[in-house]
Swiss-Prot record:
NCBIfam families: pimt, PRK00312.1
Biological classification of the source: Bacteria, Pseudomonadati, Pseudomonadota, Gammaproteobacteria, Alteromonadales
Principal localisation: cytoplasm
GO biological process: methylation; protein modification process; protein repair
Catalyzed reactions per annotation: [protein]-L-isoaspartate + S-adenosyl-L-methionine = [protein]-L-isoaspartate alpha-methyl ester + S-adenosyl-L-homocysteine
CDD domains: AdoMet_MTases (cd02440)
Keywords per UniProt: Cytoplasm, Methyltransferase, S-adenosyl-L-methionine, Transferase
EC number(s) from the headed UniProt entry: 2.1.1.77
Homology family: Belongs to the methyltransferase superfamily. L-isoaspartyl/D-aspartyl protein methyltransferase family.
Name of the featured protein: Protein-L-isoaspartate O-methyltransferase
GO cellular component: cytoplasm
Length: 211
């Protein structure tokens, strides 16, 4: 990580702290992660702006505030094993991999998955398992998970993901179509409590279609 990138990442973390992010480990991970690595060169100059940016294939790299907020919500439950649905650029995975012992991540667009794997390897993050597949179905063979994070908006909550939560596990997911709400579901035996966190805007979670 260059000195300029490090300074920019540290400044981004400070902006996120001012915006309400409080978890010190999340802020530290943001400050150590070169976001420009996850963007095309043409957009690298925008890497440390607090905004979502296109990454091709109709997908985006999420706004840093949302990355930090979702991570903070997940870490409140101290997960040991996490599933990320929607690897995308790999930036969210890079943040999570610094904060949890084991991360599994699924992507339905092969080209994005290949790029993300290469980027995390460059950052020496080796506690991540990758899967090319339909995120709606989760990763049954690797379940249960203490935490599941979905980085695209589902029209409804996928039952498969709820079923793959461990006891006490949490699902962080944007739900809705035109109007989306970031929600947290917590498993208690065979029951699930739900909590609306805030209004958000994500690309849609596509069901069953690989690219």
């Amino acid at each position: 990580m260059t000195r300029v990138a490090l300074t920019s990442a540290v400044n981004l973390a400070k902006k996120l702290q001012e915006a309400g992010i409080r978890h010190p480990a999340v802020l530290k991970a943001i400050s150590r992660t070169p976001r420009e690595l996850f963007l095309d060169n043409a957009l690298a100059h925008k890497a440390y702006e607090n905004t979502a940016l296109p990454i091709g294939q109709g997908q985006t790299i999420s706004q840093p505030y949302i990355v930090a907020r979702m991570t903070e919500l997940l870490l409140q439950h101290q997960p040991q094993k996490v599933l990320e649905v929607g690897t995308g650029s790999g930036y969210q995975a890079a943040i999570l991999a610094q904060l949890v012992p084991e991360l599994c991540t699924i992507e339905r667009i092969k080209g994005l998955q290949i790029q993300a794997r290469q980027r995390l390897k460059r950052l020496d993050l080796h506690n991540v398992s990758f899967k090319y597949g339909d995120g709606w179905q989760g990763w049954p063979n690797r379940s249960p998970f203490d935490g599941i994070m979905v980085t695209a908006a589902a029209a409804k909550v996928p039952e498969a993901l709820l079923s793959q939560l461990a006891e006490g596990g949490v699902l962080i997911i944007p739900v809705g179509e035109e109007t989306q709400q970031l929600m947290r579901f917590t498993r208690r035996s065979d029951r699930f409590s739900s909590e609306v966190i805030e209004t958000v805007k994500f690309v849609p979670l596509i069901n069953g279609e690989l690219a």
